[in-house]
């Protein structure tokens, strides 16, 4: 199902159709497939095959990120750091950048207080400790 959705998304062997891609990718995402959840997050973030919805993007990225999908973790950091969205949250951005080891965390620190940085680092450490067996 996921592969068929990606084929529709890319127009590989079928006519490109973002709505069909969304339909086919949603099925495994709903069943817990992390790659499909990540892909669905991208579709919501970009408004591809579905209306753009940052809340839904965060939901799907988070589900994938909790399973260790590193690209979803990175995208969460970027989404939370994006001033163009209504989801701006430097603490969450820093947390996810910490988890992925992304250098972007240093860029957003200029907008954060020392307490916020400390809180983000604590959240990242807690998350890593809770997921170290995954």
Predicted regions and their residues:
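Hydrophobic face of amphipathic alpha-helices that form TPR/SEL1-like repeat modules
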Residues: 1-10, 39-46, 75-82, 106-107
């Amino acid at each position: 199902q996921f592969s068929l959705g990606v084929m529709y998304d890319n127009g590989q062997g079928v006519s490109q159709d973002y709505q069909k891609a969304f339909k086919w990718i949603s099925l495994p995402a709903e069943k817990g497939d992390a790659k499909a959840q990540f892909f669905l997050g991208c579709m919501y973030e970009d408004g591809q095959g579905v209306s753009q919805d940052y809340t839904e993007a965060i939901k799907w990225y988070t589900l994938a990120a909790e399973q260790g999908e590193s690209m979803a973790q990175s995208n969460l950091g970027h989404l939370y750091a994006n001033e163009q969205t209504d989801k701006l949250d430097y603490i969450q951005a820093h947390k996810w950048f910490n988890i992925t080891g992304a250098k972007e965390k240093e860029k957003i620190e200029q907008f954060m207080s020392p307490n916020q940085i400390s809180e983000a680092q604590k959240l990242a450490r807690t998350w890593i400790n809770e997921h170290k067996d995954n």
